[in-house]
Amino acid sequence: MTCDTVVISDIHLGSPVCNREKVLKVLSLDFKRLIINGDLFDNYSFKRFNKKDWDILSKLRKLSKTHNIIFIHGNHDSNGEFMSAIMGMEFVEYYEFELNNSKFFLEHGDKYDHWIKHKPFITWFFTGIYYWLQRIDKSHRISRLTKKLSKSWIQAKDIVRTKFVEKRGKKYDVLMAGHTHHAEIVDCGACVYVNSGSFCEVKCSYIKIYEHGNFELIFM
């Protein structure tokens, strides 16, 4: 099957837990279009970048000359419009397209997260703790357990999915989000909800969409 589109999200370049090798591996795949569904950057402190981070940006810049690259605004992408212009990518709030009569709608998902809207400081604080645990806990056992026990994280991923489907599900066949770092495919009746996961977890994940409109969630 010919791959039409690859969807990745939540790379968080500059973060100590970004799996850069796997990002580069995905960017080397054969596809026609690349959609970055938010949070390409962790923040814009380039002092935190290492050689692999710059290699990824260089690869994206090179791909933009021959491929259609869509960069969807995520909550970490405060200067995304400026960076997109430099790198030759299209910067948007959301993206929609149709393949073989299937209508796709992509949005990062942070707009449906009540923690981001109403308690941003708490969100940033606990995200920092989680990343710190991933750095010191090389087996990732503590960080995975912390995530599983976090009621706010469990609620956030469910709330994002529910609100996204409520708003867009009647008009589109497939909804795709990122933000929660929880990769999943859920049949919601009127539509299918897919979350591409992230490149900051033990298992990284991304989405392949084929020319006939079928798709798969791939773990690496």
Locate predicted features.
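Structural motif
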Residues: D4-T5, R33, S102-F104, V174, ...
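Core catalytic region of metal-dependent phosphoesterases/phosphodiesterases
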Residues: I8, L13-N100
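Binuclear metal-dependent phosphoesterase catalytic core
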Residues: F97-N100, D187-M220
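Hydrophobic anchor at the start of a short beta-strand
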Residues: T5, I69, F215
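Active-site environment of divalent metal-dependent phosphoester hydrolases
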Residues: L13-P16, F41-Y44, H73-F82, K111-W115, ...
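Conserved catalytic scaffold of divalent metal-dependent phosphoesterases
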Residues: T66, I70-K171
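Active-site-proximal beta-strand elements of phosphoester/diester hydrolases
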Residues: D4-H12, K103-D110, V192-G197
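Flexible, charged surface loops at secondary-structure boundaries
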Residues: M1-T2, L27-D30, S64-K65, E98, ...
